[in-house]
Curated annotation (Swiss-Prot):
Protein name from the UniProt record: Interleukin-2
Annotated S-S bridges: 79-127
InterPro entries in alphabetical order: 4_helix_cytokine-like_core (IPR009079), IL-2 (IPR000779), IL-2_CS (IPR030477)
Function of the molecule: Cytokine produced by activated CD4-positive helper T-cells and to a lesser extend activated CD8-positive T-cells and natural killer (NK) cells that plays pivotal roles in the immune response and tolerance. Binds to a receptor complex composed of either the high-affinity trimeric IL-2R (IL2RA/CD25, IL2RB/CD122 and IL2RG/CD132) or the low-affinity dimeric IL-2R (IL2RB and IL2RG). Interaction with the receptor leads to oligomerization and conformation changes in the IL-2R subunits resulting in downstream signaling starting with phosphorylation of JAK1 and JAK3.
Gene that encodes it: IL2
Length: 155
C-alpha cells in the first residue's frame, strides 16, 4: 500500500517539476535577440554622440579607444567589455539634450547586462588589441558592424 502512495507521490512530483520548468528557447534565437538589443543600445549611443547639436563632439573625438585585432566571435565581446568604463566616462562629457546622464547610465547598464549574457561570465579570454586607436564614433560603428556580422552568421 505504501509503495503505491510513494509511486503516486513521485509521479506527481515529476509532473509538477516538468510543468514548472521553463521551456527552453533556441540558443541561436536568444543570441540573435541579445545581439539586436546590443546593436540598438550602441546605435542610441552613436546617435547621441553624432548629434549635430553636440558642442562637445570635437572634445570627445580626442579620446582614443582600442579595438581587437580580429573580432570574429562572441568571445571577442570581452574586448568591448574592457573598454566600457572609458566609453562611459567619455559619454559623461556629453550630457546634451539628446543624451542625458540617466540615459547614459541606463544604456551602459543595458550593454553590460547584454554583454554578460552573450559572452558568459568567464573572463578567461585575453584580448589582443590593434596598435592603432579609434575615435568614439569609429569605436561604436565597428562594434555595431561586429554585431551585424555575428548576427548574419546565426541566421
Amino acid at each position: 500500500m505504501y509503495k503505491m502512495q510513494l509511486l503516486y507521490c513521485i509521479a506527481l512530483t515529476l509532473v509538477l517539476v516538468a510543468n514548472s520548468a521553463p521551456t527552453p528557447s533556441s540558443p541561436t534565437k536568444e543570441t540573435q535577440q541579445q545581439l539586436e538589443q546590443l546593436m540598438l543600445d550602441l546605435r542610441l549611443l552613436l546617435n547621441g554622440v553624432n548629434n549635430y547639436e553636440n558642442p562637445k563632439l570635437s572634445r570627445m573625438l580626442t579620446f582614443k579607444f582600442y579595438m581587437p585585432k580580429k573580432a570574429t566571435e562572441l568571445k571577442h565581446l570581452q574586448c568591448l567589455a574592457e573598454e566600457l568604463k572609458l566609453l562611459e566616462e567619455v559619454l559623461y562629457l556629453d550630457q546634451s539634450k539628446n543624451l542625458h546622464l540617466t540615459d547614459i547610465k541606463e544604456l551602459m547598464s543595458n550593454i553590460n547586462v547584454t554583454l554578460l549574457k552573450l559572452k558568459g561570465s568567464e573572463a578567461s579570454f585575453k584580448c589582443e588589441y590593434d596598435d592603432e586607436t579609434v575615435t568614439i564614433t569609429e569605436f561604436l560603428n565597428k562594434w555595431i558592424t561586429f554585431c551585424q556580422s555575428i548576427f548574419s552568421t546565426l541566421t
